[in-house]
Amino acid sequence: RSLTRAGILPFLWSRLNGTRRRLKINDIEQVETQALRTMKRGGNVYYRYRTAIRGRGLVFAFASGGDEYRRMIRALLPPLSDNILDNRSIDLRDHLIDPKEVQMKAEFEHIPSAEFLRSEFGKTTSVPRPAAPPNDVERERADYLTGLGNELRISGFLPQAAEAFRRALVIDPKSSRILYGLASCLASIAGTERDLKLKRRAVAAFRLALRDPRIAGETLSRIGESLFQADEPALAERAFRRVQDEFGGNFRAARGLAEIALRDSKLAYVIHHFSAANRFSETPAARRWTRGEVEYFSNLNNDDEYLDLEIGRVEMLESLDGLKRSSLRIALFGFPAIMIGLLVDDTLIANIGWSISAIALLIWTGMNIGVKMLAARIPYDLVETDDVN
């Protein structure tokens, strides 16, 4: 099986520049998903997910917006190794279902509405603790509530998701899986509300999850990845080190340590950790990707000229990306002038608005082309060829 760019334009483009337009499933190296908050209503958030699939130099991107995206996720992600999926992609694979079905499950569990839960959110209430460890029936009940909480969280029903996790914690208060789900939910709410206090509570929940003596290595490494995304590199590194010390290491932990080392500009450690990730790789595609990362950062570490070129490329890429965002905002500022000119029948105001928007959009188009050209790394062979010449 493979992914193929359909349509006449991708076909013509691949013919013109000789690029591939087909990617085998076995050649997928990375799957990353971004969540964009498109609208907020009564405590609930409407997410738009964008999943990027990379391999063999190709990038396929899919955006959510209906049942087609859910079918694509269900068909594409389950056969892939967890190593090549980021946290959010794993969540989508395991918990993405129709929002209407999720709401029906919440109603069946008598979980109150988001408006009611939001009014009660933050109030201090005593949480009963079980006198004895949960039995098999109670643990199964806690697992169901945890799954429901994750489904509600992925669908954007964040207050109801937090309530589902709270009920699961009443049954099994020390479970790392439940605490991890609750922490992820609190982090999402904190990002939506821009609440630093709630963000600290999310980090505290992640730290509580780390105390579970039953915690699995994969859960521990996923918590480390979440802590790194929450801008807590010290806690993330501690979690990844625990995976190494207690479980012998795994791919996600080694990759996470490499990203932390890269953040600190420690190229030798980056190379070391990507080499470890290569040893933990379960698929040829993952081994190929990690081997490429080792070669790339080794070239950066050994060749100052190549390092300077790449630093210049990244700095220029960041500058163009900032100009692209600014030009788009300027283009949007021109639309009110266009509307005012049309409403008051003043062609001068309308023409000024059209000029501002048109020029800004042209600049945005040029910046977008520049960003795409600079996104790819400079091949090291070009530097070697110049040195030989």
Q: Which role does the model predict for each range below?
A:
Residues 61-155:
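Terminal and domain-flanking low-complexity segments
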Residues 144, 178, 219, 253, ...:
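TPR alpha-solenoid repeat register
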